[in-house]
UniProtKB/Swiss-Prot annotation:
The keyword Lipid metabolism does not apply. Signal peptide: none annotated. One of its GO terms (molecular function) is rRNA binding. The lineage of its organism: Eukaryota, Viridiplantae, Streptophyta, Embryophyta, Tracheophyta. This protein binds specifically to 23S rRNA. One of its GO terms (biological process) is translation. This is Large ribosomal subunit protein uL22c. It comes from Nandina domestica.
Amino acid sequence: MEPEVEVYALGQHICMSAHKARRVIDQIRGRPYDEILMILELMPYRACYPIFKLVYSAAANATNNKGFNKTALIISQAEVNEGTVVKKLKPRARGRSYPIKRPTCHITIVLQDISKDKNFYIWLRKKGGWIYKEKYIDIREKYEYFLHEALNRGRMEWANSGYEVVWDKK
């Protein structure tokens, strides 16, 4: 029996159009947790903040409830469904009123721990297109390798080789 490798967070009745939320969700689907937080922090859309809170909540569920490492989390599923429409009446001239429709949406974020999943394979994007990679490379390892290469080209020493880099914003 395989261990559970997924954890989720669900946001219901978020006051925004499902179309606007999907625009942001499509940008973060399949990416690692660290990269998602940076992308959502820098995107200029109003939908980013509720999605940021959901991703952060799902990661907190993963670490507290399941004991997963945040550096090995990716978004395996992210979906946006239409919710109910909140209807209000706006008073107008001569005793009339116009209806106002406020759409809502339901957002589901599912995070997967890659280090615990034996059957996980990752697709990497290269200049020529997508290539299939059978072995998962930890994001932290890629980051450390990049820093090591950049600093060695400049003939500098890098002392913090064992430091774990996780960007966490509350």
